[in-house]
Amino acid sequence: MSGRVRPIVVLVGPPGSGKTTIGRRLANALNTSVVDSDVLIEQLQGKPCGVVFAELGEPNFRDLEAEVIDFALTTAGVVSLGGGAVTTESVRQKLRAQIVVWVDVSAAEGVRRTAVENSRPLLDTTNPLERYSELLAQRRDFYKEVADYRAHTDGRSPQQIVADILGFLETLR
């Protein structure tokens, strides 16, 4: 067995699915740390992730994100990835060696949760529900490809979701 450090679990899913909240609570339950790729990008660039995305454009942002994820995947604990990270092939390849949970949400609920923020350039449109639905359609197969477990979040408390993920992780021991 390799002595290499790796995450306990990696969370993927669309914006507003609850990855950040679930990641913090899951890390707390596992008595470990949480690393969020969006937060790492913000720290590296010194500005909000949405601003970095808008300034760099999606292709350059995804390249930066992939580099940050390379680092994040060398840390122990829980790792939470940005919603579009799975669109990058090199990221999906690296996730094959990880335990990945897809934190899933419906388009309507995802839009409701992200409506209070103005930090999501891909959702800055006159019809956020339509755009969110398009993003889900574009990314769904990528989430399925990398996920070992799917946690539905609509109508469920963070505590319930964390309990489900902990139950899944227990089956791997």
From Swiss-Prot:
GO terms for cellular component: cytosol. Binds 1 Mg(2+) ion per subunit. Transmembrane segments: none annotated. The keyword Signal does not apply. Its EC number is 2.7.1.71. Mg(2+) binds at residue 20. Substrate binds at residues 38, 62, 83, 139. Its main location: cytoplasm. GO terms for molecular function: ATP binding; magnesium ion binding; shikimate kinase activity. One of its GO terms (biological process) is amino acid biosynthetic process. Pfam families: SKI (PF01202). It is found in: Cytoplasm. Keywords: Amino-acid biosynthesis, Aromatic amino acid biosynthesis, ATP-binding, Cytoplasm, Kinase, Magnesium, Metal-binding, Nucleotide-binding, Transferase. Its cofactor is Mg(2+). It catalyses: shikimate + ATP = 3-phosphoshikimate + ADP + H(+). Pathway: Metabolic intermediate biosynthesis; chorismate biosynthesis; chorismate from D-erythrose 4-phosphate and phosphoenolpyruvate: step 5/7. The keyword Ribosomal protein does not apply. It comes from the Bacteria. It is an enzyme of class 2 (transferase). Catalyzes the specific phosphorylation of the 3-hydroxyl group of shikimic acid using ATP as a cosubstrate. Monomer. This is Shikimate kinase.
